[in-house]
Curated annotation (Swiss-Prot):
Carbamoyl phosphate binds at S57, T58, R59, T60, R108, H135, P136, T137, Q138, C274, L275, R319. It comes from Limosilactobacillus reuteri (strain DSM 20016) (Lactobacillus reuteri). L-ornithine binds at N168, D232, S236, M237. InterPro entries: Asp/Orn_carbamoyltranf_P-bd, Asp/Orn_carbamoylTrfase, Asp/Orn_carbamoylTrfase_sf, Asp_carbamoyltransf_Asp/Orn-bd, Orn/put_carbamltrans, OTCase_ArgI. One of its GO terms (biological process) is arginine biosynthetic process via ornithine. It catalyses: carbamoyl phosphate + L-ornithine = L-citrulline + phosphate + H(+). This is Ornithine carbamoyltransferase. It is found in: Cytoplasm. Gene3D superfamilies: Aspartate/ornithine carbamoyltransferase. The lineage of its organism: Bacteria, Bacillati, Bacillota, Bacilli, Lactobacillales. Pathway: Amino-acid degradation; L-arginine degradation via ADI pathway; carbamoyl phosphate from L-arginine: step 2/2.
Length: 335
């Protein structure tokens, strides 16, 4: 294509236009096919990549590590206790230190401001692996999965996020949908509607791309005609019991059940989730929730999670292919 993403950081999908985002998604498809066929290139050969994780991770860490290795890069993992970032050394100083040693930096942590500072001062591409406000790499996998299964152009796929409308994944989905010209519904309690800042940003982009952003408290109205129903956890780990109880009371009516899936009036509707999901009692956290609050399932029922509508594990695999595409597009030799 006639544009170049080399040396660009990947902080939020709002930083990209439709063609750039389509390019990364198309590249992910190509890289996935190459991996399946066993003839991957080494587009990141000789590159050194730092992975900063202030929060624990399964899918994001594995996706960056496997994706980088597939393309010939070397990875250094800095876990929650493995660096001084923000504690004994400022983010700005850390950026300048790591920028002198590495060709690219991934950051997964709390503050969006931190990933922006890393990008500003490191002098190398920085990739947002998750912050409290945004989760852009997740959304590329979400969109690619829906596109693969539904065989529809991206702009024709309709997404509805059901749950906490201020959730970082919902924010990222909204911005991504706006960039791609898609229809996106946030189905959420009034108390948890998206912030004005995020909604204004999405609508500003949507005005240029033809996207449609809808916020509603009505579940039936919000999911009708949708192609994808999306859910995420209701509460982050480490929150107080009072916060758990408050969130559960607010969001219990927004649990994704088979009735919600049927309310789409679309027999081919998909269910997506960024994972991990609390859909049964097979985890210690699930058992604790059941003991304290009497819930055997939270944001999604086990019936939906294990149904033919669910594409969550294909979606999880696609984290690796899309993250690989982001690294190759911004750091590799392919462009």
């Amino acid at each position: 294509m006639a544009f170049n993403l080399r040396n660009r950081s990947f902080l939020t999908l709002a930083d990209f236009n439709t063609r750039e985002m389509e390019y990364m998604l198309d590249l992910a498809e190509d890289l996935k096919k190459a991996k399946y066929a066993g003839y991957e290139g080494k587009n990141l050969k000789g590159k050194n990549i730092a992975l900063i994780f202030e929060k624990s991770s399964t899918r994001t860490r594995c996706s960056f590590e496997v994706g980088a290795k597939d393309e010939g890069a070397h990875v250094t993992y800095l876990g929650p206790s493995g660096s001084h970032i923000g504690h004994k050394e400022s983010v700005k100083d850390t950026a300048r230190v790591l920028g002198g040693m590495f060709d690219g930096i991934e950051y997964r942590g709390f503050s969006q401001r931190n990933v922006e500072i890393l990008a500003k001062y490191s002098g190398v591409p920085v990739w947002n692996g998750l912050t409290d406000e945004d989760h852009p790499t997740q959304v590329l996998a979400d969109f690619l999965t829906a596109h693969e299964v539904l065989k529809k152009p991206y702009k024709d796929i309709k997404f509805a996020f059901v749950g906490d409308g201020q959730d970082n994944v919902s924010n990222a989905l909204m911005l991504g949908a706006a960039v791609m010209g898609m229809e996106y519904h946030v189905v959420t309690p009034k108390e948890l509607e998206p912030t004005k800042e995020t909604l204004d940003k999405a609508n500003e982009i949507a005005a240029k791309t033809g996207a449609k952003i809808v916020v509603t408290n009505d579940i039936k109205e919000g999911v009708k005609g949708m192609d994808v129903i999306y859910a995420d956890v209701w509460v982050s780990m480490g929150e107080s019991d009072d916060m758990w109880e408050k969130r559960i009371n607010l969001l219990k009516p927004y649990q994704v059940t088979m009735d919600v899936m049927k309310a789409t009036e679309n027999p081919n509707v998909l269910f997506e989730h960024c994972l991990p999901a609390f859909h049964n009692l097979d985890t210690e956290v699930g058992k604790e929730i059941e003991k304290k609050f009497g819930l055997k399932e939270m944001e999604v029922t086990d019936e939906v999670f294990e149904s033919e509508h669910s594409v969550v594990f294909r979606e999880a695999e696609n984290r690796m292919h899309t993250i690989k595409a982001v690294m190759v597009a911004t750091l590799g030799e392919q462009n």
